[in-house]
Amino acid sequence: MPSSQALNHSIPHALNLLGEVAMRKWISLVSVAALGDSVADSLLRLPLLRAMFCELIGLKVGMIREATELFLLGLLSVMDALLNLPMAVVLQEITVGDDIKKALLGRSSRYRPIFGVVLDYESGTREQLEESCRHCGLHENFLPDLYLQSVRWISDILAEVPVTA
């Protein structure tokens, strides 16, 4: 079997063996470990924080089936900065759904309101945050707890990354 066919077979096989939750955790760990010391700490934490925050907001507003895609949206949200390429170029090189692409490019999509809440919460723009929360049907009083859950999740993930000397 050619290597590309083997890879196409091995990824779904790994997903079946590990399960989605374990695979997501593994991908998060590999991503963090692979970046190493050359990338600022904020660029290590930010995609993980956004990923979990997007997922938790989605779950809170009833987008249970979309949780994995919302996680991916957050994870990919800083790939342009990590790769030093425009987001449009990054998105040409990977296969993701249109809703994720549109949200990352600032266009209207099912996921853009949730991503907007995340960005507005980070930037502290109160009026815009209120509008974003209204748009996705979320009461903003839930955000500090969801954010804290995301931060705790990152701490747990990073605690599992072996320290190399």
Regions found by a protein language model. Give the residues of each.
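Conserved alpha-helical "signature site"
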Residues: 1-165
